[in-house]
Amino acid sequence: MRSVITVHPGFEASWPWAADHLHRLWQAQGPVEFLRTAPGDNRTLSKLIPDPATVTRLVALGTPATPECVKAFSGLAEISLNDAHGQPDIAKKFADRGVTVIGHTSEGYWGQSVAEYALALALCGLRRIPQNHHTIISDLKPWDYSPATPPVPGGRGHQFGDDARFVNGTIAGKRLRIVGAGNVASRFAAFAHALGADVAAWDPYASEPSFHRAGARQEHHLERLVASADIFAPIIPLTQQTEGLITAKLVDALPAGCLVVLVTRANVCDMKAIRRRVLADELALAADVFDLEPLPLKDALLGRHNVVHTPHNAGRTRQANEEFAARLVERFKPVAG
């Protein structure tokens, strides 16, 4: 058996930790050749790998492939072709020749990273952690917890720095309402449930066990889901079917003070309605994704007291890279010991 991994710089621009981890995993199984090309080196697989006819297992990470490559790798049993946009035509040609083509069956490799980030955004939004962090760099006012004179019930008090106009404090006891029950949404639901949140989710494509395992009650009506939300998190991919799924009518039905968490794709929501209500201090927002990216430096959402914002980096951890590699390796046939 001859195992080869090739890596193109274009792939590593998106997944800088994946190739080396995949290499380590295959090294644990036996000999493996690892070919990392330099920027500008766009040789195809059959030009890059010596004696291609003897290769039996191949992972191509961004390396170009052509129909000539399909012919050249005559001894190939399994192949994984990976780049930013995929190579479906070449993959089909390998499959038609009897080669097992291996790829990801889902984007679960970054599920844990994005779900943890969603939890962090929710906690930051509830407690205004980023705002307080930033303000005390240049202002002592946040340290002053002096109440109003006379003190007002439900007002500022000793070490109470939350904004009572919005949902605040602990996630325990909050009504978390999630759109989605997939790899990210179900994990986020489970985390919040473990911390004491009352979790309900809507996803017409998910099976009942998806909700049960996540500690979420299944809601069958979006209108009912949004109406009871302390925290609202639409966590679904952006497709033709889901774009604008959360309409202005649904956004307007969110209770005043609700915290909206955006961590997958913003445009599943009517973002004009989200912006309108956030800028009117009717909703709080904790978001890693936006309708416009990058956000212009003068965007009205930036720096607001009721907005937590980060630059779309929830999913790309080292662990997500390593999981990307591990899930590919798991799909190859076991190597005889």
Region spans (language model):
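Glycine-rich adenosine-cofactor-binding loop
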Residues: 9, 145, 149, 159-193
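Phosphate/diphosphate ligand-binding glycine-rich loop within oxidoreductases
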Residues: 56-150
